[in-house]
Amino acid sequence: MIEKLDFKADIQTVLNDFDTIVKMSPWDDDHQIGLTHRPNATNLWKDSVGSLYTNGKSSGVSENEFTELNAQIPETLKTLLLDFAQSQNIKLGRVRIMRALSKRGLTVHRDTSVRYHLVLKTNIDSFFGFRDLKQTNGVAAHCYHMPADGHFYKVDTTKFHFIYNGGKTERIHLVICPR
């Protein structure tokens, strides 16, 4: 369900670009910063944040609509994203920086396609979990930890999944939705 890819980034360079982005678009209550947006969007940093579904119902917006990279993204990060997309033979859809604060998580859900993750900051008590529908021997979920090792990870988020940050520090991932 989680595949470590050969494609690797210089994590310190990405973190430097991340710091630049947070200065332009500080965190708010949704704990997401969008790096792509729809054509003619008015708030380029926030257009792609949040869920495209509410109570299981589509908002009418598709991942395929997020076709524009924010022009204010540092060039090194922009190049990394485009090189990564080319290496995976995908087109970039929604690209977001997503943060989970200490002792916080996301509810069980599933997405319409796989996601690619680059871990920027994490801790050993931060997990990505997948529901086990069989619940063999009472096991209801399988949890994984993705390290901040510079590798991109392909995650099959079409399966029911959740994240939980049980650590004392924030967890930050760059998340790419292909289109």
Short names for language-model regions:
Residues 1-84:
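Non-heme Fe(II)/2-oxoglutarate
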Residues 82-102:
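A short glycine-rich, His/Asp/Glu-containing loop-to-beta-strand
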Residues 99, 110-126:
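Short, conserved beta-strand element in jelly-roll/cupin
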Residues 106-109, 126-128, 153-167:
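Short beta-strand His + acidic residue motifs that chelate non-heme Fe in jelly-roll/DSBH
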Residues 110, 120, 130-132, 165, ...:
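Residue-level recognition of conserved beta-strand positions in structured domain cores
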Residues 121-148:
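A short beta-strand-loop-beta hairpin characteristic of the jelly-roll/cupin
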